[in-house]
Amino acid sequence: MVKVNGFSFVARSAGIRKSGKPDLGLIFSTVPARCAGVFTTNKVQAAPVLVTAPRIAAGECQAVLVNSGNANACTGEVGMQDALRCGQLAAKSLGIDEQLVAVSSTGVIGHPLPMPLLEKTIPGMSEGLSETAVDDVANAMMTTDSFAKVASRQAGDSAPYTILGVAKGAGMIHPNMATMLSFVMTDACVDQHFLQQALRQAVEGSFNIITVDRDTSTNDMVLVLANGESKTPEIVADSAEGQEFAELLRGVLLDLAKMIVRDGEGATKLVHVCVNGAADDGDARKVAYNVATSNLVKTAFFGEDANWGRIIAAVGYSEAQVDPSRIAIFFDGVPVVQKGLGTGPELEAQATDVLKQAEFSVTIDLGLGDGRGEYYTSDLTYEYVKINADYRT
Amino acid sequence: MVKVNGFSFVARSAGIRKSGKPDLGLIFSTVPARCAGVFTTNKVQAAPVLVTAPRIAAGECQAVLVNSGNANACTGEVGMQDALRCGQLAAKSLGIDEQLVAVSSTGVIGHPLPMPLLEKTIPGMSEGLSETAVDDVANAMMTTDSFAKVASRQAGDSAPYTILGVAKGAGMIHPNMATMLSFVMTDACVDQHFLQQALRQAVEGSFNIITVDRDTSTNDMVLVLANGESKTPEIVADSAEGQEFAELLRGVLLDLAKMIVRDGEGATKLVHVCVNGAADDGDARKVAYNVATSNLVKTAFFGEDANWGRIIAAVGYSEAQVDPSRIAIFFDGVPVVQKGLGTGPELEAQATDVLKQAEFSVTIDLGLGDGRGEYYTSDLTYEYVKINADYRT
């Protein structure tokens, strides 16, 4: 069980979810932590986002309260009051300033929070705090997730610290609106400005290669809290330590991001789409995005069909510079297309074996330049349709 | 049975499709027709597109040969030779110049056409031409389509002519790469330049509101042939007759486009997404597109769930100007959101009844300006996944 100095956790079943599953989690740091956040770019923002974003921008945070079962989105002024009230209840229970509490919600949109349940449950939560209960919080954040998502990294012996993250999210097929929440705790001491910069960068190389900025839900939120309780020297930008911290942070977020794809609603496969040889990185990313989000490509993955025709067509309708006669496509190492033409039935049969795996890569070489981009995606399955057709009913 | 003066049709089972279904169609005009075309914008273009586009641009066409079962795409130089050869065979059989033959293909990508079958079948086709066999051609164009798509309009008594169209296409869920073909025959006499302009406009208001430019397959093609055999006066731009022709042409294409959505792979519902009150038409179209292509919205339609939360979130992540507190959403006439807030369980129950219908509209009013846009979409179902996972195997 990974612990992080100064952090403790607790979860409860408040009854927001009718199933009676845990639906309320609390993360607490014994001292105020420096913090950074990345929030949804959706123009429709849920009340907890509106309440929390300015608090994080102020630079210090000591607790995160998260509920599942209700997004507190599209709930108007009542929703704002409810989000503030939840923060107050947590602050009072913990004996801290309410401005140091981040609040976060995920679940159905358009229904007010069941405040009587929260009024009853939040006040007693601080009593249950435990430094080993991070899994409970990860569990309480779940909506259609099929497993709790926790990842961590440790820094080396000379100045040891830990980065521990939890996340929630599963609807990444086309990533519209499937709320993604992630909270990262570290006992490192990190310069505030660098912390925000490192988080932004880490999100770009993790959550943003399973989703894209515009495809955000009303509630998306990634927070990092650095409380300095490792008592190691302050980590600043443009240093070896800063570089190491940034890499470890990205490692935690990428682990969580891959778990989200693997847990994509109904998904049975994790596919790494890599694009090389593009005119530039932007082009590479566009191509990777188009391939990774094509329903026809994703259903072919589910059908374990090495259908490179669908891939090459998705490459072609991207806005990237493309010369069809230079395209090469590989499933893991197996070339199925060279110079824009199929390589024949024998290699296609080998590629079909690759597709039978639970994890594989599709590499597309455009043969034009040095641009690179990547994306993680899953297959599109019967189960996806079932989950999303039945979600509210 | 709608007939168009001077046009005749024939279809055959050449054996390209292993099922033995008809897979080869021929459309013939007794005289060379003025023509116009809209072709895929995909950077990867199939051989028949490369062969046909310049012929149509030359302004005259007398025959269209179409096959299903094989797209002749990503087939390199061999594919080009095969496409040219098919045109030659048809031209010879019909006794016309090969430059007057358009060729078109749909089906799997990356396999050469089975030329021996085509060499054997095409030469005898002209013998079977019949002016009442348009349905046979529509039938021979089908791939995953579940029904043949034919629509027509007649112009008024003073100068009567007919517009008759066929189309193929069914994979419009996210419209990536699902080839869309349409051929329109009219005996009107139409100015060549105006014909191209009217076609472009009609496509914008029909096929392009079920798909978008970038989401084109390697093979997409819409052709119109106007042979003048109605012997009515030439129709030119900026005239009442031109206006009428443009409207009738759009009517035919919109009928065909709706059939394509209704036949969307596995689709059970046809949904008209209307956006009003946007800052401008471009914004309205962006919002309509985002809502119409959201997998989560579409699975909610399948689940007959009036889940306006998913709709409002899709509105929010569009790039359009949005003020959440002004959004209104209606299912047919039933308001489920006013000023960004839900209207309560009673109206939501009424909306759920609307969703039980096979056809309904979702109207989104952004409350900002006069911008309008629309889109037709379908639901996302188990059957979609099944069809696309199994398509090649």
Curated annotation (Swiss-Prot), chains A, B:
Q: Which GO terms describe its biological process?
A: L-arginine biosynthetic process; ornithine biosynthetic process
Q: In the Enzyme Commission scheme, what number(s) does this protein have? A: 2.3.1.35, 2.3.1.1
An example of a GO molecular function for this protein is: L-glutamate N-acetyltransferase activity
> Where is this protein localized, as stated in its record?
Cytoplasm
Q: What SUPFAM superfamilies does the record point to?
A: DmpA/ArgJ-like
Q: Where is this site: Involved in the stabilization of negative charge on the oxyanion by the formation of the oxyanion hole?
A: 106-107
What Pfam families does this protein map onto? ArgJ (PF01960)
Entry's family note: Belongs to the ArgJ family.
Its name, as the record gives it, is Arginine biosynthesis bifunctional protein ArgJ
